[in-house]
């Protein structure tokens, strides 16, 4: 279990640790603690303006402090200064924030928060998924946090609509599913939005790639190759896509298309598009595919699709094959080769009756490079494979690995290994030269293992 204890005020089903009683300070027993907490919450929920947000402005905080003092006085219970502060912080989190989850959402070392009913809250801490000591009182307590998440978005979660995708004010992605579909109580999955996008240099420092690989990828983006970033869930695909996007020249017109906006491009000429779910009446849905089609009419130099997961794969291929070179996207898959099979399946989801060979020809013509990521057993994330998509031979798409990460073992829980070129110079090397990208042929020669220990 993660040794990340929230303060007593954030453990919803526990009283604070007993303190020695004196004439001026007495310990608050669990019953009194729960009474104070519930009365304060009820009073504040009834009297606080519905327009209050989790921004925690001084004005809203003063209102909460005033009502809190009145409730404590009405109850007539002696509270120590520490107990008073703990209860106040809890109420503040419940009213303006997300209750016991606040401590996790504010921790920069936490990247994902997973709630499995009221009594099991997990967090991804520095790449490892562990259970925390945070708990809710009951299912209703979890649902209050759910309502706090979806209400500002005009969404609802109930038996008729038991699943919802949402986004927190800071950009973090949220998925909620409730009973009767979730058998053990409401489930909340939060993927936190990083405060800043990792640069290529930061990825190098974290051991995700080498400086040589970064220079190669920079040249590929500069030469307007079409690149697919692939990997499983939580491998860092969006992070790497952000880093690759930083190599795009500032004078290019870039259109980004996402299901939930996560990309943070710094170039001046960026148009950000985001898909929209249907409203409560089931109307107004705008899909990624519709946005990709519309983007082609907006004179883009580059199209960056956050993730291809359905029929928009066909439109993305057509865009790449009709003059929109230098496009970038991500795909869920288990390897570079599996990425091609995955895209084949996604194209078929477009509903077009296309022969499999025709789809493969489109893929082979559109994709230049696949950058595959993996989360290793120690929680680290690395680019483990960079493969060139070359051509068709018969009915098979020919691929060739350019770089690999070779794992040699595990030492004290840390993955050991090294990055290496495969000794094969990509067929698009001349295209890099024509674009003025200075990549030495020696870049593609296997070298002495550069051992990475992170």
Residue ranges and their predicted role:
Residues 1-130:
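N-terminal anchoring/assembly modules that precede and organize ATP-driven motor systems
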Residues 52-54, 75-80, 96-107, 149-166, ...:
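Active-site phosphate-binding and catalytic loops of NTP-dependent enzymes
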Residues 107, 115, 120, 124-223:
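P-loop NTP-binding catalytic core
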Residues 194-205, 242, 246-293, 339-343:
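P-loop NTPase switch/communication element
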Residues 258-271, 295-394:
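Conserved P-loop NTPase nucleotide-binding/switch module
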Residues 229:
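Hydrophobic anchor at the beta1->P-loop junction of P-loop NTPases
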Residues 379-454:
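NTP-binding/hydrolysis catalytic cores, primarily Walker-type P-loop NTPases
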Residues 237:
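Conserved lysine of the Walker
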């Amino acid at each position: 279990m993660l040794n990340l204890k929230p303060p007593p005020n954030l453990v919803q089903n526990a009283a604070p640790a007993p303190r020695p009683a004196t004439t001026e300070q007495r310990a608050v027993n669990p019953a009194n603690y729960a009474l104070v907490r519930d009365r304060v919450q009820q009073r504040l929920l009834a009297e606080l303006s519905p327009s209050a947000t989790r921004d925690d402005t001084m004005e809203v905080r003063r209102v909460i402090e005033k009502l809190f003092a009145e409730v404590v006085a009405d109850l007539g219970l002696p509270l120590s200064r520490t107990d008073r502060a703990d209860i106040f912080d809890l109420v503040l989190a419940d009213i303006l924030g997300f209750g016991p989850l606040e401590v996790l959402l504010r921790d920069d070392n936490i990247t994902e928060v997973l709630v499995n009913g009221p009594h099991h809250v997990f967090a991804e801490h520095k790449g490892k998924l562990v259970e925390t000591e945070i708990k809710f009182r009951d299912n209703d307590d979890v649902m209050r946090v759910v309502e706090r998440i979806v209400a500002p978005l005009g969404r609802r979660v109930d038996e008729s609509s038991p699943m919802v995708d949402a986004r927190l004010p800071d950009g973090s992605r949220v998925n909620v599913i409730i009973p009767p579909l979730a058998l053990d109580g409401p489930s909340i999955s939060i993927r936190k939005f990083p405060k800043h996008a990792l640069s290529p240099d930061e990825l190098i420092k974290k051991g995700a790639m080498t400086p040589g690989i970064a220079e190669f990828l920079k040249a590929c983006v500069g030469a307007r190759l079409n690149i697919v970033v692939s990997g499983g869930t939580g491998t860092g695909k969006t992070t790497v896509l952000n880093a690759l996007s930083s190599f795009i020249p500032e004078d290019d017109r870039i259109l980004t298309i996402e299901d939930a906006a996560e990309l943070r491009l710094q170039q001046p000429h960026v148009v950000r598009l985001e898909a929209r779910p249907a409203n409560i009446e089931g109307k107004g849905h705008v899909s990624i595919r519709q946005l990709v089609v519309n983007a082609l009419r907006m004179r883009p130099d580059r199209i960056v699709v956050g993730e291809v997961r359905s029929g928009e794969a066909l439109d993305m291929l057509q865009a790449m094959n009709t003059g929109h070179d230098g496009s970038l996207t991500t795909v869920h898959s288990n390897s570079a080769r599996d990425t091609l099979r995955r895209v084949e399946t996604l194209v078929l989801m477009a509903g077009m009756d296309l022969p499999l060979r025709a789809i493969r020809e489109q893929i082979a013509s559109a994709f230049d490079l696949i950058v595959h990521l993996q989360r290793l057993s120690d929680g680290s994330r690395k680019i483990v494979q960079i493969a060139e998509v070359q051509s068709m031979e018969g009915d098979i798409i020919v691929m060739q690995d350019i770089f690999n990460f070779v794992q040699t073992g595990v030492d004290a829980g840390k993955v050991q290994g090294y990055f290496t070129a495969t000794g094969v110079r990509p067929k698009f090397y001349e295209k890099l030269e024509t674009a003025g990208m200075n990549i030495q042929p020696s870049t593609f020669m296997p070298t002495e293992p550069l051992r990475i220990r992170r």
